[in-house]
Structure formats: structure tokens, C-alpha cells
Curated annotation (Swiss-Prot):
The keyword DNA-binding does not apply. This is 1-(5-phosphoribosyl)-5-[(5-phosphoribosylamino)methylideneamino] imidazole-4-carboxamide isomerase. Signal peptide: none annotated. Belongs to the HisA/HisF family. Keywords: Amino-acid biosynthesis, Cytoplasm, Histidine biosynthesis, Isomerase. Its main location: cytoplasm. Its EC number is 5.3.1.16. Pathway: Amino-acid biosynthesis; L-histidine biosynthesis; L-histidine from 5-phospho-alpha-D-ribose 1-diphosphate: step 4/9. It catalyses: 1-(5-phospho-beta-D-ribosyl)-5-[(5-phospho-beta-D-ribosylamino)methylideneamino]imidazole-4-carboxamide = 5-[(5-phospho-1-deoxy-D-ribulos-1-ylimino)methylamino]-1-(5-phospho-beta-D-ribosyl)imidazole-4-carboxamide. It is found in: Cytoplasm. Pfam families: His_biosynth. One of its GO terms (molecular function) is 1-(5-phosphoribosyl)-5-[(5-phosphoribosylamino)methylideneamino]imidazole-4-carboxamide isomerase activity. GO terms for biological process: L-histidine biosynthetic process; L-tryptophan biosynthetic process.
Length: 241
């Protein structure tokens, strides 16, 4: 299985930021020009981008549209986008705007039929975002924890054309404490849908650990460690290959 790296651009108030454990008031601004950041990642050799509208995740509707459109104009790389996408109309609008894949998180738990219907109609374009704390699904921008296991939610989307699952351990996100390999591997073994690891990646050894897990893990999101310089792009790309 190909292992793809997705540098993350998290958008808050039009800027590229990183959060600690999903807390909006714990945001560090890394670039006030997200399009510039997208160009930089492309120049480093990354072939895909992972973009999150953080304001949108909390508002339940797209907020940073201008910043997203700037990213799309700045790079030829396929962009997957999440954050506040809760309706079929929003899905269609983003795909028409040039987004490669939309990530559906909260709505995957609240209205799984909407997600399944969209995935069947738009094969390869729908990604399910499963954010978990201690193995349980969290929703509404991580403000709430549900009583559903992450593996249970993942299995609900088998066979309907979902392109991938982005699995985030929110207890580790932004902390650089190391990716949760057992959690990601358990999910990857539980379903045939490609699973992408997210949350806590601290260095190139985490990429190697995901690849060496024996689970069919399809890739990893790279966040704070890439911005802080703890991950060198060329080394990460080599490890992923």
C-alpha cells in the first residue's frame, strides 16, 4: 500500500495555525498567508495537502472560504478539506471549487446516511474524519465525546465508497508526544477503508513506526512537528517511500 504524507494547514481567522488538543485559545500562528504555506509545502516535495477550517468546525458551516480558495490557486497538489462541512450542498460546493476530497467528521456520527449517500454518489471524494479520545469518538470540534467506539463508527462506512478515514487521537494532537500507533493499527485492521494517521507525530521515527506496524495504514498527517522543524521534509518523504 502506498503511504502518503499530508502536511496540515489548519485555518483560524484566515491564518495558518496549530492548536494544542483542539483548543482554539491555544493557537500558534505559523503563517498569516495560507497560500504561501501551501506553496512552501509543494516546494518541499509533498504531493498532497490536508486543510482544516477550524472556525468552520466550531461554527458548523464553512468560515475560511477565501483562505481555502487561495490555497487551491497556489498549488496543483490535491487538497482534502474538513471543518464544518455538514450538508450535501456544502460538499458539492467545495468539490466544485476544486477541493479533491471533503472530510466529514461530526456529521458522520450525527447523520451517517448522508455520508453514505454522498460517498456512493461521489466515489473517491468523501473522507470520514474520526476524532477519538481514549478510543471513543469526539465531535463538534472535539468539544463533546460520544459513547461510540472509533472502530464501531469506522465499520459503519464499509462498502459505500468512502475514500479514506482520517483517524485522529485528540489527546495527542499538537503535542508531539508520538503518534498512537496501536489505535491507528486497530482501526486499519478493523476496516478495508484506507486509514490515515493523525495526531502527535513528532519525528520521522513515527512515520517509520506506522509503516512497520503490520497494519495497512495508508498515510499520515504532519502538523506541528513539521512547522517546528522536528521533521525534515526530505527525510519524511524518504521514510514514507
Amino acid at each position: 500500500m502506498t503511504f502518503t504524507l499530508y502536511p496540515a494547514i489548519d485555518l483560524k481567522d484566515g491564518a495558518c495555525v496549530r492548536l494544542l488538543r483542539g483548543e482554539m485559545d491555544a493557537a500558534t500562528v505559523f503563517n498569516t498567508d495560507p497560500a504561501d504555506q501551501a506553496r512552501a509545502f509543494h516546494a518541499m516535495g509533498f504531493t498532497h495537502l490536508h486543510v482544516v477550517d477550524l472556525n468552520g468546525a466550531f461554527a458548523g458551516a464553512p468560515v475560511n472560504r477565501a483562505a481555502v480558495e487561495g490555497i487551491l490557486k497556489a498549488t496543483p497538489a490535491p487538497v482534502q478539506l474538513g471543518g464544518g462541512i455538514r450538508t450535501r450542498a456544502q460538499i458539492d460546493a467545495w468539490l466544485e471549487a476544486g477541493i479533491s476530497r471533503v472530510i466529514l467528521g461530526t456529521i458522520a456520527l450525527r447523520d451517517p446516511e448522508l455520508v453514505k449517500t454522498a460517498a456512493r454518489a461521489l466515489p473517491g471524494r468523501i473522507v470520514v474524519g474520526i476524532d477519538a479520545k481514549d478510543g471513543m469518538v469526539a465531535v463538534e470540534g472535539w468539544a463533546e465525546t460520544s459513547d461510540m467506539k472509533a472502530t464501531e463508527l469506522a465499520k459503519a462506512f464499509e462498502g459505500c465508497g468512502v475514500a479514506a478515514i482520517v483517524a485522529t487521537d485528540i489527546g495527542r494532537d499538537g503535542l508531539k508526544t508520538g503518534v498512537n500507533v496501536p489505535f491507528t493499527a486497530e482501526l486499519a485492521h478493523a476496516v478495508s477503508i484506507p486509514v490515515i494517521a493523525s495526531g502527535g507525530v513528532r519525528d520521522v521515527n513515527d512515520i517509520r513506526a506506522l509503516k512497520a506496524s503490520g497494519a495497512p495504514i495508508a498515510g499520515s498527517i504532519l502538523g506541528r512537528a513539521l512547522y517546528d522543524g522536528d521533521i525534515v521534509a526530505s527525510e519524511a518523504i524518504e521514510a514514507a517511500g
